[in-house]
Amino acid sequence: MSGIIVFHGDTPIAMSQTTDISSIVGNDIIHINDYALRIVPRKSTLLRIHVHSLKELLDINADYTPKYHTLIKEGKIEKGSPFDAIRNINDMSWCELKLYDAGTDTFTVMHHAPKYTIEVTLNKQQMNITDMNELKKEVPVRQTESTTKDIKSKSKTVNWNDIVEEDETKTIMFNLPDDSNPDDDYWPHRSLKVRMSDEYIARHADEENNSFFNPVSPFTAIMNKMHSTPTQGQSPQTPTVVPNAVIEFEGLVMESIKTRMLNESPSSVMVAGQGMYIKMFSMDEKGNISIITRNFSKEKLKLVIIETPKSVDPAEGNRTVIVTSKPVSNGIKLRKLERGMFLRAGDIDLKMAPCANLAEATSECTKFVRAFCKAYNSVVNSNLAIKFPSELD
């Protein structure tokens, strides 16, 4: 495949061999190895990069000029490979390759780093994942074997050009060297994840507890509240960090939805659906995030999107909240995410009932959102409470 890079947008950019990402306007598109990256700034240091297939872009813009392929490294765009970009971006924590539309064999790659969020959409017919000879790097690979009742995993080391899909689940998984959680059995179906290294964990772990887990995080109090009733006369412990959000119920989206990016802005509460699991988290003013991750079976999913209206804070835009409707397969993983880092800290037993149809799915989603918000409101000051529209009352 030829390496090309093309910008589209209101402000054309003269591309040199190295370009600062921060200078790229939101609607610009970079073509890399027959894929196009759409870079969308989110807040001051967060970027969204969306890669479309070249054919999709040619349908809307037939006039493009092949130039050269690039990589993104430490906030710069340089010559190289798009997958090198994902591996080498500064202090990367993980990325995910997820089949979101089996009918068109279209994949989504997501990468979260301390300063940037990258979403990449690849078309299987244009890029053969098993034919990346230019990389030839040894990486530990985790492939998932699973049922609807439990998830088992295994690891092996292969070359990039030896990565093979699992026919049934379309799952491709690999780790960076020195995987932080070699025994971690939490791996969603149809996903490829790059985990942070032990060195990265050592640099960022909490010095006092040698852990990312914060036992007094707001979600710890919230989730405990959902499963227990305080003794009469007792008041729930107020967390040291309290998020703020106004949540509105918006509607349903089918399972083939393209994953929405997370808006990592302070003082917000979000739930994001990504294929077989959801993440629910809060970020404090210092950038520390408490996160709950739910793991689901590989059955079809329906998603509910809930957003805060732009009128709440026009400068920040909408904050996305997505709740999945299928039953949990092995409970909830409670994690603390700090500047893009993931580490399992413990499990909480909270499950949704199985859903036989869309109506039940909608009902279960609503029940979960209401239960969470009710618990949330019980541990925060009234001025920080989540406000419900009539659909959730």
Swiss-Prot record:
GO cellular component terms given for this protein: virion component
Keyword annotations from UniProtKB, A to Z: Virion
Main location: virion
Places the protein is found: Virion
Name assigned to this protein: Putative outer capsid protein VP9
Organism for this UniProt entry: Micromonas pusilla reovirus (isolate Netherlands/2005)
